[in-house]
Amino acid sequence: MPVISLAEVDNVLGTSTLPPPQLPTTEASSVAQYRQFIRARLAEPLFVETLAKELLPFVVQRPIMPRALVQGKTRDGRAFYYRSIPCPSSQLTSVRPWWDLTTSVLICRDEYRPTVLYSSDHTTECTSPTSPTFGCGCGPFLLFCARDAKQKAVLDAAVYEEVLLTLKHVIDTRRPLSDLLTMNETVRSGYGDFYYARTEFLLHGDPAVLAIRLDAPPTLKPRPPQYGGGLLSMPGLLYADSARRVIMMLLWSDLLCLPFRSVNVEPHVLIDAARDKPALRSESHEELTVTPGCQNCHSRLEYGLRAFAGWSFGQIGTSYDPKRTVASTRFYGADHTDLRDEGPATPAWLGAEFVSQPEFAACMVHKVGELVFEGEPVPGALSRYLRAEFARTQDLATLVEDTLIARTFGLATLSRGTASN
Amino acid sequence: MLAAVAVVPRGAYARPVAGAGPGRRPTKFLQIFVSGGLDSLFLVDPKSRDEVKPRIAPVYTAQQLVESNGMRLAPNCRPLEPYLSRVSVINGILSGTVGHATGAVQTLQLRRNIRSSSDATIATLVGQALEPESPIHAFCLGRAESLWRPTAGRVVYDEFPSYELLKRFTSVVNDTHDDLGEHVIQQVEGLYRDARTREAATPVRALLQRLKGKVVPPPAVFDSSSIVFSPNLRDPSISDAAIAAFRAKGDRTLMESFQWALFLLKNNIAPSVWMSSGSYFNWDTHQQNNGRQDVNTAHLMLGLRWFLDQLAASPGTGGRTLLDEVGIVISSEIGRFPYLNAQEGKDHFPQVSAILIGPGLRAGQFGQTDAELIGLPVNLRTGRPGGSSDTILTLDDVGRTVLEWVGARAPRESGYDGRVMDFCFA
C-alpha cells in the first residue's frame, strides 16, 4: 500500500490547488496509477515553480528594480513623466520611450540624462536604489525606467518567467537538465526580449533593435551568441545583484551544494588592501586567488567571474562589451586546492563545467530528495540509486517521479524494473 | 521571501543546573539579525577624533556619548539607558568573512566553522535547550533574504513571513470555532500546506493548542520618527532629507517583528525566536553610509526600547517579569569597512560587534578595537586587553557563550568549539 496519498503528493509538488486527478479509482494504489498522476502533475506550471524554488532559489531572490515613472498631468497634449518630483515646464524634454517608439513623451531633463550610464566615479552602473544621487537618469529611450508601476511589475515578472518557462521546457521535452546551464535559447515573452534588446542597443547603438512586440507570448527562441550558458546569462541571474561575487557564490552553493566557508579573512589584511582604494569592491581582484585567507573562496569567485567579464552586473541593467572579455579561465571545486579544469572564459564553458561536476548530480538528487521526503532522511540506498541514474540521464522529471514512487512504494519498486522509462 | 519555523527535536538537550556560565539563565531567547551589515561606530563602538585615524567617521565628542555601567556608547543607544545594567557589549569579534551569504549562515549558527548551511540554527539549538519538549523550538520572523534562508534541521518554508502564517493560524483558532475540533485542525493543516510548508501534522496541532485563546496583536503602528528626531536625541548631522526618507519608509517591518516576537514569547508559543532587523538593502550601506546607518541604528534602538519596555511590563514566573527571562543577542553577518568608499559608503569588514541583553550577564563593554577598528587581543578572563593569554575574540566564541548562557548541554557535540567568554557573565 502507498505510504502517502495522492493528496500528499500534490502537497509535495505544490499542486494541491489543482482539480483532483482523473483516475480510474479515486483511491489510487498501484505504482502505475501513481506514475500516471505524477506525470500529469509534472507538466503543471505550479510544479515547475515549486521545483525552481527548491533547485534554483537564487533566481527568485531579488526584484530587478527598473524604476517606475509617475505620469503627471498632460502638458501641451503630451504625456508627462517624472520619477519623484515634477519639474517646471521649462525643464521638460521630449523623448521617444522604449515602450512606444512611435510617440514621444515629456520628461524632466534631470531624470532623462541619456549619456549618464554610470555613477559619477564610473565604478558602478546606475544600479543602486540610491542611484539618483549619482546622477543617473532614465537613460536613452528611457531604457532604465518603466512607464509606471504596472509596467515595472510586468518587467520584473518577465525575468522570473523566463527562468521558469525555460526550466519547464527542459522538463516537458525531457531534455537533460544540463541543457538548462548550457543552452543559448530561452523561453521568453516580448517583455523578456526587452532586456536583451536593451543590451544590444547599448552595444551597437541601433534603435531598431528596440522595436519589440512587447505583447508577444513566450516562445523558445535564440539569444545573441554571447548568451551561452543557459540560465547563467539570463537576466534573472545577471541582474540579481550588483555585487557580482554574491552571484558567483550562489552558483557553487545552489548548483553544486558546495557552501562557501570563511577560513579567516583578517581585518588588517583587508585594511592594507583597501584603505586607499575606494573603488575596490567593483574591481577585479585576481590577487585574492593567491592571498592566504582569501584564496579558498576567491579562487572560485574571481575565475568564475572571468566568464562574465564582458558584462557589467546590476539590478537595473547590464551592458555587454566584447572588448572587456578575457580569453581563458579556470574552474575550482571545493577550494583553491581543487582545480578541476581550464578553458575559455565564457558562460557556456562555465555552465558546461558546472553540469559535468559529480557534485551537480549529487546536489540535484539531494534537493529533490529534500523536496519529496519533506525533510525526512532519504534512505542511503535510494540516494545512491538516484544519483547513479540521474548522473546518467540528467532527466529531472524522472528523478522527481522515481523519488516520489520510491517514497510511496519503496526502493524495491524501482529496482524491480518499474522505474520510469 | 522565505521564512522558517524549526520544529523538530534533534537530540534534545537537557539543561544543566551547575557549571560554568551565569548565575541566572534566560528561559526564553530572541536573536535579532541586523541583516546587511551594522556599522559599530554608530552603536556600540563609538570613537572620538583622537582615537581613530583621519578619514574614519563618525566620531563623537564626550558630551555626545552615552556612558553607563562602564560602557561608552553612541548617541543612538540613548533609548537603552534604563536597561544598560542588563547589557553586555562585545566588540572586535572576528567573523572571518566579508560575504553576506557566508556571514548570514554564520550568524544564523553563530559560529564560523559551518559544516552545512542546513544545520540547526542557534535559535533552534537554544530553543531545544530551553524547552526540549516544545513542539516549536524556534520561530523565524520577518523576511529573510532567500539568499540566506534560515535553516534548522527540518525546515518549514513558507511564502511569507511567519507572522503572516501566525495570523492565519490565530484567525482560524480564534474566530472560526470555539474549540479545536478536527475540522479546524484540517483547515490549518491545509493552510500550512498551501503556504508550501513542509511539516508533519503533529507540531501543527501542538502549535494550535498553544495558540488557542491568544489574542492576536493588531498591526503595529509605531511612529518612532517623532522620538528619533526629537530635539534632545537628534544628531545635527542627520539631514532633513534623511528624516523625510525615514518617515516615508516607516518602520512597520521591524516593529511588526518585535511585536510578534513579544507575542510568541509572552504566550509561550515558542521558547526561541529569530527576527530580522528589516531589509538588507537598508543596512548594506555601500552608498551614503553615515546618514543611512545613523537612521537605521536609531530606528533599531527605538524598536528595541519598545520591546524591552513591553517585557518589563509583562509578568513572568516567580514574581519576575519577562525582562528577567528573555535573553537577546543582536549582531550582523559582517561589519563595515572603517573608511568611506568613493560613494561615501562603507564596504564589508570581517569583524562584528554583538549585543547581549538579559539575565545573568555582567553589564559592560568588552573587546576593544584600535585606531583602524581592528579587534585587539583580549584576556578571556576579563574581556579586555592585557594579560598573558590575550586572544582575538571570534564568532565561535559568541556561539559557544550563548549556548553556555542558556544552559545547553555539550555544545561541542554540536560543533560549537569556541571558547566561553566568562567575562560576559555575572
Question: Which ranges hold each PLM region?
Answer:
Chain B
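Ligand-binding pockets and gating/stacking loops
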Residues: 1-426
